[in-house]
């Protein structure tokens, strides 16, 4: 049985860091229904489970609380995505960052940060003052991105506090290796 995802909160949306640079051939835009097939491929690759266009349409629908899905598109197609979702009963006053993913071939280009930041701008423009998300212990590059954007871990149980301690130590170690390398 897998553990529940770890929780993070960005307590303030008014002071976002600048967007990271990206190559001019990469466009940040809102997703359209014609992207569903490519989004299914990307999400299958990023999360290791099977997606199809029908599942994308259902998961990223207004009926599921999703207000917008953003993508980074390259000449090869959709290479990164994140969605803006609202769950007001669970997280009043906060937007929920939903399904951040990038193609394996594009990792390291900070495209996840680009689309996540766009989702945060969406939330701020909609009058929200916070954002929340859930992530997995093993997604260290994603956690590093969220920390860079100002998210803070919010343990919900004593077990979460221990898990966060391990995750943050791992992030610190890998950051040190990158700086020295």
List each model region and its residues:
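Conserved beta-strand-loop-alpha-helix junction that forms the acyl-donor binding cleft
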Residues: 133-143, 159-169
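Conserved GNAT acetyl-CoA-binding A-motif
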Residues: 123-135
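Conserved acetyl-CoA-binding loop-helix of GNAT-fold acetyltransferases
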Residues: 102, 108-125, 144-148
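Conserved acetyl-CoA-binding loop of GNAT-fold acetyltransferases
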Residues: 1, 147-156
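A conserved beta-strand-loop-helix scaffold within acyl/acetyltransferase catalytic domains
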Residues: 47-101
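A short beta-loop-alpha structural element at the N-terminal edge
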Residues: 27-39
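Hydrophobic adenine-recognition pocket in adenosine-nucleotide-binding enzymes
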Residues: 31, 100-102, 135
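Acyl-donor-binding surface of acyltransferase catalytic domains
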Residues: 1-24
């Amino acid at each position: 049985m897998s553990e529940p995802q770890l929780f993070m909160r960005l307590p303030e949306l008014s002071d976002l860091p600048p967007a990271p640079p990206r190559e001019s051939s990469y466009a940040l835009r809102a997703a359209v229904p014609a992207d569903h097939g490519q989004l299914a491929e990307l999400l299958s690759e990023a999360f290791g489970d099977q997606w199809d266009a029908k599942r994308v349409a259902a998961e990223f629908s207004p009926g599921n609380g999703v207000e917008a899905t953003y993508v980074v598109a390259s000449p090869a197609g959709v290479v990164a995505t994140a969605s803006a979702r609202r769950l007001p009963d669970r997280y009043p006053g906060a937007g929920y960052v939903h399904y951040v993913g990038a193609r394996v071939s594009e990792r390291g280009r900070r495209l996840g940060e680009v689309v996540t930041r766009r989702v945060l701008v969406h939330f701020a423009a909609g009058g929200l003052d916070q954002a929340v998300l859930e992530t997995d212990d093993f997604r260290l590059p994603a956690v590093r991105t969220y920390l860079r954007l100002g998210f803070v871990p919010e343990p919900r149980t004593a077990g979460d506090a221990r898990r966060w301690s391990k995750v943050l130590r791992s992030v610190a170690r890998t950051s040190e290796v990158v700086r020295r390398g």
